[in-house]
Regions:
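Conserved SAM/SAH cofactor-binding pocket of Class I
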Residues: 65-116
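Class I SAM-dependent transferase core
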Residues: 1-75, 112-113
Length: 116
């Protein structure tokens, strides 16, 4: 997707990200939808740095998902303060969507970012 001439997502970047942080097919589908929605909104609102669009999968998605490996085993309740464009909270929520009892709370003080 090309957003205001800022560059398209590099397909090789997505492959690199998935090699770094493998996910289930269901999680991948949720992540793809999130990235698609983020890039659509990015056309009207600056949610991520425009220069990071080509590498959104490694720079933002994989970077967010690596937090799952740093958390205590079985951590189910997460909070993302200053969520902005949804990183790292929404990728973590995508990964934990099938985990019973998992909750991810996103907190954002800027109204237009919170509306996203």
């Amino acid at each position: 997707m090309n957003t205001r001439g800022q560059g398209a997502v590099d397909p090789a970047d997505k492959a690199r990200a998935l090699a770094l942080t493998p996910v289930s097919r269901e999680t991948l589908q949720r992540l793809e939808l999130f990235v698609e929605l983020l890039l659509l909104r990015q056309q009207r609102q600056n949610l991520i740095g425009p220069s990071t669009i080509p590498v959104i999968w490694t720079r933002h998605v994989a970077d967010s998902l690596q937090l799952l490996d740093c958390a205590p085993a079985g951590a189910k309740i997460w909070a993302d303060f200053g969520s902005g464009g949804g990183f790292p909270g929404l990728p973590i929520a995508c990964a934990l969507a099938d985990t019973p009892g998992a909750m991810v709370h996103l907190v954002e003080s800027v109204g237009k970012k919170a509306n996203f």
